[in-house]
Amino acid sequence: MMIDNKEILKSFSGSAPLFALPNFVMFPKTAYNFNVFEPKYKEIISDILKTNKLFCINLKKDNSKSEVNNIGTLCYIIESKKLDSGNYTLIASGIKKIRINDINKTKSYDIAKLDLIEENDTVTEEQLKRKKLINKFISLVASSNENINLNIIDTSMISTEMLTNLGSLILPLENEDKQKLLELNDV
């Protein structure tokens, strides 16, 4: 399913509910399946499904209950299903890198005031860099313990930015290292 990020961003008001996660970094132009079972996050999903389906994911800082990294990703719910238990399964797509300006507690969850971060996604010598990146990505994934079918990735349809972010998302890196990759200014 192709989504139009520019169209989705038209409904962005400058703030979004905050998913502060202790062990996950989301990247723009990637998608991820979530099982939502905590009451606070179920309330967020219930609320945003009634509006623009936007929320932001930020990695919690080490051993912190409430402090989050300033840089995260604005996400859009592509697909969701409410289970009989009240839990949700959903697929979210990373839309744009964001910076948190302020956090307001309005309900049982936080709403973050956000700035969209414009990235330098111009890649010089695009084809050569893509080829090197694809080869490195395939060798790293093949050498990991992950059981990933690399044939499902159509690299001809993937931008260099998307490929870089996909690699950052699925490679077996520490979350702090993934956060550092998310905070980089360009591909």
Residue spans for each PLM region:
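N-terminal low-complexity, acidic/polar interaction/targeting segments
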Residues: 1-187
